[in-house]
């Protein structure tokens, strides 16, 4: 509006107020109404309004932002029109106010127009002569209507107010920027955490791989030495391998050496012994150190993979299998292979009981020096037994090759052998449940050799003296010294007649033809021993026939009428289960059939003894139309005369070759008190003198 268009109630020519009045008017708050009121400014409340509220003039939409109290236009003595005010926007700092703008920094007191300089402009502006100017300078309506900070309008129109309002704007902007940065910071933290977690997972994976490699290096010690064939951990079933008797070996009694020899098993025990990981067949002779020093033990123990296979705690039963002993260690354990420690002797040598420094008992089978036959058996036993681990089989726990000395080390079982309890001086009679348990356990062990080993293993020396018993009378099949690895397509393994007379199958005794059914025949003879309590061959000469010849017709009659009284051991006093007796008699009769093809497999015998198969299932080994029990009536079967002729021929061969009984480890010196079945050579001599030439046997 023009200069002369002031409100009617406004004074026509406002005189410049005194400095004091101007101060009071400057401090007065603008009128409450939005319109430019003509009323003179009433004395407002005290100074706190002017100092405390920088009335932003921005909310008055019709007028541009006030010049922020810098009404310093040239010659505008209280008549600041709109145009001048518009021109003064942004010129708040000019020098046209004649030094009146010394207090330009009004700290946001934009609307009062009182620069506290006492100039004419201040007085004119405070009198409200210019409505628009008052609206802009005094912020009459804007002061009441604009609680928000002088934001948008003042920012656009005047550069200096933004300076006063800069802190709020910058703070608002800062809050926005910080809000935008928060997600970025969280994302960065998440990425870093994920990368760290991935790194930890990779480290754990590498550690697991390293441990697996170390475990693999432990087994090569045995596998690389020809001990393990991948049949599983050789040391996981040591709890079952508590057997140690018969060990075919020479008894060269050498002066005992000092007793502080340590066994490979004892982790740090004093006696040194060398525990070398070298394979048994060609291992180098035991190196120095037979003096029993712990240093020798540690040096020999280290081997290629020694540290990776720490010796087990002494409480573990004999620890590792197939460990190398020094001769001095075994001599010390057996008190110099003294007679008091002699368990038995046989064609290969002697068996001595030994006690290791850690208190464990062992049985040491030593081979006769210079016995080529014994050396061959030693090689076979070390190679085969080390590959076999089963609950019902004996495991080789150590060996010794020192120059010409070759010895096998087994766990010692204090419960002796089946032969001892059946025919020895134990003074106790095995009850029927124990006999059945022994039969079942030995059948499972032999079935494992025949059907679960690859290549399969034929024992070739099944007999009562090779069935060891633990404290609970669990059976353990022992002495694989005669066993040979037999490929499926190879049946003629050896012409050397091994084994014990009375247990040999007819076809094997006559021709040396070897199959798993030869072991079945020997097992059938052992079952007859359990049932009858008789030996395979009568050593007294009172019974001309063998146990098999005597029992065959009785088994047939018992199967027909169910009367087993003539067959059963009288010491049992008829204390047995009839159906269990029928099962065992049927298994024995089927196993000793003349025809090898008609004998059942060991797995079939196991099922029959457990009661899981009918007796007719035992005939599955034969051809259709043949007798299901004893195999009679078939032209392919041996008759009694043929079998007897074969036995006579075998007796003559055994006498001439002196190989009979070579596999037996117990002789007259056996602690069992009686000659074992293998020592029936005297009976052979008695009967062999009367034998005539026999026709060659036929195996159809």
From Swiss-Prot:
<feature type="modified residue" description="Phosphothreonine">
    <location>
        <position position="495"/>
    </location>
</feature>
<feature type="compositionally biased region" description="Low complexity">
    <location>
        <begin position="255"/>
        <end position="265"/>
    </location>
</feature>
<feature type="modified residue" description="Phosphothreonine">
    <location>
        <position position="500"/>
    </location>
</feature>
<feature type="modified residue" description="Phosphoserine">
    <location>
        <position position="494"/>
    </location>
</feature>
<dbReference type="GO" id="GO:0005524">
    <property type="term" value="F:ATP binding"/>
</dbReference>
<dbReference type="InterPro" id="IPR011009">
    <property type="entry name" value="Kinase-like_dom_sf"/>
</dbReference>
<keyword id="KW-1133">Transmembrane helix</keyword>
<dbReference type="InterPro" id="IPR017441">
    <property type="entry name" value="Protein_kinase_ATP_BS"/>
</dbReference>
<keyword id="KW-0067">ATP-binding</keyword>
<feature type="region of interest" description="Disordered">
    <location>
        <begin position="659"/>
        <end position="700"/>
    </location>
</feature>
<dbReference type="InterPro" id="IPR001245">
    <property type="entry name" value="Ser-Thr/Tyr_kinase_cat_dom"/>
</dbReference>
<keyword id="KW-0808">Transferase</keyword>
<feature type="modified residue" description="Phosphothreonine">
    <location>
        <position position="326"/>
    </location>
</feature>
<keyword id="KW-0325">Glycoprotein</keyword>
<dbReference type="Pfam" id="PF07714">
    <property type="entry name" value="PK_Tyr_Ser-Thr"/>
</dbReference>
<feature type="active site" description="Proton acceptor">
    <location>
        <position position="461"/>
    </location>
</feature>
<keyword id="KW-0472">Membrane</keyword>
<feature type="glycosylation site" description="N-linked (GlcNAc...) asparagine">
    <location>
        <position position="176"/>
    </location>
</feature>
<dbReference type="GO" id="GO:0004674">
    <property type="term" value="F:protein serine/threonine kinase activity"/>
</dbReference>
<feature type="modified residue" description="Phosphoserine">
    <location>
        <position position="465"/>
    </location>
</feature>
<protein>
    <recommendedName>
        <fullName>Putative proline-rich receptor-like protein kinase PERK6</fullName>
        <ecNumber>2.7.11.1</ecNumber>
    </recommendedName>
</protein>
<feature type="modified residue" description="Phosphotyrosine">
    <location>
        <position position="508"/>
    </location>
</feature>
<keyword id="KW-0547">Nucleotide-binding</keyword>
<feature type="binding site">
    <location>
        <position position="365"/>
    </location>
    <ligand>
        <name>ATP</name>
    </ligand>
</feature>
<feature type="binding site">
    <location>
        <begin position="343"/>
        <end position="351"/>
    </location>
    <ligand>
        <name>ATP</name>
    </ligand>
</feature>
<dbReference type="InterPro" id="IPR047117">
    <property type="entry name" value="PERK1-13-like"/>
</dbReference>
<keyword id="KW-0812">Transmembrane</keyword>
<dbReference type="GO" id="GO:0005886">
    <property type="term" value="C:plasma membrane"/>
</dbReference>
<feature type="compositionally biased region" description="Pro residues">
    <location>
        <begin position="266"/>
        <end position="286"/>
    </location>
</feature>
<keyword id="KW-0597">Phosphoprotein</keyword>
<keyword id="KW-0675">Receptor</keyword>
<comment type="similarity">
    <text>Belongs to the protein kinase superfamily. Ser/Thr protein kinase family.</text>
</comment>
<feature type="topological domain" description="Extracellular">
    <location>
        <begin position="1"/>
        <end position="186"/>
    </location>
</feature>
<feature type="domain" description="Protein kinase">
    <location>
        <begin position="337"/>
        <end position="615"/>
    </location>
</feature>
<feature type="compositionally biased region" description="Pro residues">
    <location>
        <begin position="29"/>
        <end position="47"/>
    </location>
</feature>
<dbReference type="InterPro" id="IPR000719">
    <property type="entry name" value="Prot_kinase_dom"/>
</dbReference>
<keyword id="KW-0418">Kinase</keyword>
<feature type="compositionally biased region" description="Pro residues">
    <location>
        <begin position="9"/>
        <end position="19"/>
    </location>
</feature>
<feature type="compositionally biased region" description="Polar residues">
    <location>
        <begin position="689"/>
        <end position="700"/>
    </location>
</feature>
<feature type="modified residue" description="Phosphotyrosine">
    <location>
        <position position="410"/>
    </location>
</feature>
<feature type="region of interest" description="Disordered">
    <location>
        <begin position="1"/>
        <end position="180"/>
    </location>
</feature>
<feature type="region of interest" description="Disordered">
    <location>
        <begin position="249"/>
        <end position="315"/>
    </location>
</feature>
């Amino acid at each position: 509006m023009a200069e002369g268009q002031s409100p009617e109630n406004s004074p026509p020519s406002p005189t410049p107020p005194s400095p004091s009045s101007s101060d009071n008017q400057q401090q007065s708050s603008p009128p409450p109404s939005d319109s430019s009121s003509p009323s003179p400014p009433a004395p407002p409340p005290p100074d706190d309004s002017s100092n405390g509220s920088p009335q932003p003039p921005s909310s008055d939409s019709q007028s541009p932002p006030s010049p922020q109290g810098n009404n310093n236009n040239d010659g505008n003595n209280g008549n600041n029109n709109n145009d001048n005010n518009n021109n003064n926007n942004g010129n708040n700092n000019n020098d046209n106010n004649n030094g009146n703008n010394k207090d330009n920094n009004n700290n946001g007191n934009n609307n009062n127009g009182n620069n506290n300089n006492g100039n004419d402009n201040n007085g004119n502006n405070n009198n409200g002569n210019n409505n628009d100017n008052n609206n802009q300078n005094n912020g009459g309506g804007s002061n009441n209507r604009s609680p928000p900070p002088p934001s948008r309008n003042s920012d656009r129109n005047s550069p200096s107010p933004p300076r006063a309002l800069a802190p709020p704007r910058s703070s608002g902007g800062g809050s926005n920027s910080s809000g935008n940065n928060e997600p970025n910071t969280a994302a960065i933290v998440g990425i870093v955490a994920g990368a760290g977690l991935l790194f930890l997972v990779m480290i754990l994976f590498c550690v697991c791989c390293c441990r697996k490699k170390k475990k693999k290096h432990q087994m090569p010690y045995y596998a690389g030495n020809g001990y393990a064939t991948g049949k599983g951990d050789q040391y996981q079933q040591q709890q079952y391998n508590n057997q140690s008797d018969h060990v075919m070996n020479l008894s060269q009694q050498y002066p005992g050496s000092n007793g502080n020899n340590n066994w490979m098993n004892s982790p740090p025990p004093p006696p040194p012994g060398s525990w070398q990981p070298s394979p048994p067949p060609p291992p180098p002779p035991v190196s120095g150190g037979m003096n029993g020093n712990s240093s020798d033990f540690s040096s020999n123990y280290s081997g290629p993979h020694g540290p990776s296979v720490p010796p087990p705690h002494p409480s573990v039963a004999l620890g590792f299998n197939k460990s190398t002993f020094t001769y001095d260690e075994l001599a010390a354990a057996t008190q110099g292979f003294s007679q008091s420690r002699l368990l038995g002797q046989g064609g290969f040598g002697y068996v001595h009981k030994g006690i290791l420094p850690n208190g464990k008992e062992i049985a040491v089978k030593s081979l006769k020096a210079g016995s080529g036959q014994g050396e061959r058996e030693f090689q076979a036993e070390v190679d085969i037994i080390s590959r076999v681990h089963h609950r019902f089989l004996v495991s080789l726990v150590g060996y010794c090759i020192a120059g010409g000395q070759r010895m096998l080390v087994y766990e010692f079982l204090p419960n002796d052998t089946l032969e001892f309890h059946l025919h020895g001086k134990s003074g106790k009679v095995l009850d029927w449940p124990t006999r059945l348990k022994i039969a079942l356990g030995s059948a499972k062990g032999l079935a494992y050799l025949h059907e679960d080993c690859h290549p399969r293993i034929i024992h070739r020396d099944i007999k009562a003296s090779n069935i060891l018993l633990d404290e609970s009378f669990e059976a353990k099949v022992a002495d694989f010294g005669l066993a040979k690895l037999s490929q499926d397509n190879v049946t003629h393994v050896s012409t050397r007649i091994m084994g014990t007379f009375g247990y040999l199958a007819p076809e094997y005794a006559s021709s040396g033809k070897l199959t798993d059914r030869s072991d079945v025949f020997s097992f059938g003879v052992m079952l007859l021993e359990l049932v009858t309590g008789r030996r395979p061959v009568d050593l007294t000469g009172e019974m001309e026939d063998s146990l098999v010849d005597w029992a065959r017709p009785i088994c047939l009659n018992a199967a027909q009428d169910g009367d087993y009284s003539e067959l059963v051991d009288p010491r049992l006093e008829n204390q047995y289960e009839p159906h269990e007796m029928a099962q065992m008699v049927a298994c024995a009769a089927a196993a000793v059939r003349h025809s090898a093809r008609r004998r059942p497999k060991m797995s079939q015998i196991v099922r029959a003894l457990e009661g899981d198969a009918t007796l007719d299932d035992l005939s599955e080994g034969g051809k259709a139309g043949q007798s299901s029990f004893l195999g009679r009536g078939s032209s392919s079967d041996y008759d009694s005369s043929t079998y007897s002729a074969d036995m006579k021929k075998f007796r003559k061969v055994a006498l001439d070759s002196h190989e009979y009984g070579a596999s037996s480890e117990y002789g007259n010196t056996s602690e069992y008190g009686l000659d074992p079945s293998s020592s029936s050579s005297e009976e052979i001599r008695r009967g062999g003198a009367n034998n005539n030439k026999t026709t060659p046997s036929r195996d159809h």
